[in-house]
């Protein structure tokens, strides 16, 4: 698939088939995560792959946005590795967001679907999955083959014009 086509056609999948995701495809998604850019190339991303039915059931205790996917990845960053800027601002969450974008584009290219889930019980997720103290969970990616009746949502093609989201040189009053 051409890159521009991939960008336009990718959509949030919230209906998954029961078909298991092949190991080869999981490996390709994880390779996309590995090569994604991060601040100062510190690579603080830490990814937990969840496909065992018992662990997927535990995930349901942490969020209602699991969409019954046959695979999920919990994306965290290691705060002992994450770069901090000169104002001591943590870059880990931005790094993980970039990593997730690479992963979502790759998995869509592989015929899979996903959506970003940022709404979860943080403490319960840490407890259920024994997440180390120095790891910060940022998001969950439910992943799988889209169900046949899955289509882009009604807002998928509704985009603001460039003029509504971009300014040049400085912002003016009222923007």
Model region roles, listed by residue range:
Residues 1-175:
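Acidic, surface-exposed loops and disordered segments
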């Amino acid at each position: 698939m051409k890159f521009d086509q991939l960008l336009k056609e990718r959509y949030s999948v919230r209906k998954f088939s029961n078909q298991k995701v092949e190991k080869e495809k999981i490996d390709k998604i994880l390779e996309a995560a590995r090569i994604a850019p991060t601040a100062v190339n510190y690579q603080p991303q830490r990814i937990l792959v969840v496909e065992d039915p018992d662990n997927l059931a535990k995930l349901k205790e942490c969020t209602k946005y699991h969409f019954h996917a046959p695979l999920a990845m919990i994306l965290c960053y290691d705060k002992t590795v994450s770069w901090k800027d000169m104002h001591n601002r943590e870059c880990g969450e931005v790094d993980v967001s970039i990593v997730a974008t690479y992963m979502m584009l790759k998995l869509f290219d592989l015929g899979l679907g996903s959506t970003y889930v940022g709404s979860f019980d943080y403490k319960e997720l840490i407890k259920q999955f024994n997440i180390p103290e120095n790891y910060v969970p940022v998001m969950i990616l439910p992943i799988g083959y889209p169900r046949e009746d899955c289509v882009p949502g009604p807002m998928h093609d509704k985009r603001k014009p460039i003029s509504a989201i971009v300014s040049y040189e400085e912002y003016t009053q009222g923007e």
